[in-house]
């Protein structure tokens, strides 16, 4: 029986991080966690990491699609945070963003790691951006690294 599993080291990988500016006080912590993880666990050179900023979470799928279309990257890490308010806007944003990012991954056959917080409160966002509940940006970076290696193994 052959089992395919990906590790984390991917020293030659080219990674794009697409990040929304809205709620930047949270997102910058996610970005720090992602970059640290790519460098420490993935052994990815800083020269091979490109950060692309966009206004908000709704724009992430289009930016990810354009990045994927270039063919220059082995994976995309999407980062942002959507915090529930008093209207149904949260549900629409989260649903469409999630669908859009998944579509990019399938359309271009590239890992698009999901590091976008979808939370009810600012406190929950803070907890998931590097305090009590870990750093979801770092976790998304690990997922991207592992998927690069899994897909490489499948293709070899």
Swiss-Prot record:
**Coiled-coil intervals:** none
Query: Which residues does the annotation say bind 5-amino-6-(D-ribitylamino)uracil?
Result: 22, 57-59, 81-83, 114
A GO molecular function term, named singly, is: 6,7-dimethyl-8-ribityllumazine synthase activity
The pathway it acts in is: Cofactor biosynthesis; riboflavin biosynthesis; riboflavin from 2-hydroxy-3-oxobutyl phosphate and 5-amino-6-(D-ribitylamino)uracil: step 1/2
In Gene Ontology terms, what is a biological process of this protein? riboflavin biosynthetic process
- Active site (UniProt): 89
Report residues binding (2S)-2-hydroxy-3-oxobutyl phosphate: 86-87, 128
Q: What reaction does this enzyme carry out catalytically?
A: (2S)-2-hydroxy-3-oxobutyl phosphate + 5-amino-6-(D-ribitylamino)uracil = 6,7-dimethyl-8-(1-D-ribityl)lumazine + phosphate + 2 H2O + H(+)
Q: Does the keyword Transferase apply?
A: yes
Q: Which UniProt keywords apply?
A: Riboflavin biosynthesis, Transferase
Record EC number: 2.5.1.78
Q: GO CC annotation: what is one?
A: cytosol
Q: Assembly state and interactors?
A: Forms an icosahedral capsid composed of 60 subunits, arranged as a dodecamer of pentamers.
Q: Which purpose does this protein serve, as stated in its record?
A: Catalyzes the formation of 6,7-dimethyl-8-ribityllumazine by condensation of 5-amino-6-(D-ribitylamino)uracil with 3,4-dihydroxy-2-butanone 4-phosphate. This is the penultimate step in the biosynthesis of riboflavin.
> Could you say which protein family the record assigns here?
Belongs to the DMRL synthase family.
Instruction: State the name under which the record lists this protein.
Output: 6,7-dimethyl-8-ribityllumazine synthase
Tell me the organism.
Vibrio vulnificus (strain YJ016)
């Amino acid at each position: 029986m052959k089992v395919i599993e990906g590790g984390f080291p991917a020293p030659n990988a080219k990674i794009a991080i697409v990040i929304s500016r809205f709620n930047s006080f949270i997102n910058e912590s996610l970005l720090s966690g992602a970059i640290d993880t790519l460098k420490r666990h993935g052994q990815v050179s800083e020269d091979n990491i490109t950060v692309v900023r966009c206004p908000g979470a709704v724009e992430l799928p289009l930016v990810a699609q354009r990045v994927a279309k270039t063919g220059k990257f082995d994976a995309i890490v999407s980062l942002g945070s959507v915090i529930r308010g008093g209207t149904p806007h949260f549900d629409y944003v989260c649903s469409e963003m999630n669908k859009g990012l998944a579509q990019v991954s399938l359309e271009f056959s590239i890992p698009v790691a999901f590091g976008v917080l979808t939370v009810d409160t600012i406190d929950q966002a803070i907890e998931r951006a590097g305090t009590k509940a870990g750093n979801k940006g770092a976790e998304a970076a690990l997922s991207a690294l592992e998927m690069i290696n899994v897909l490489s193994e499948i293709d070899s």
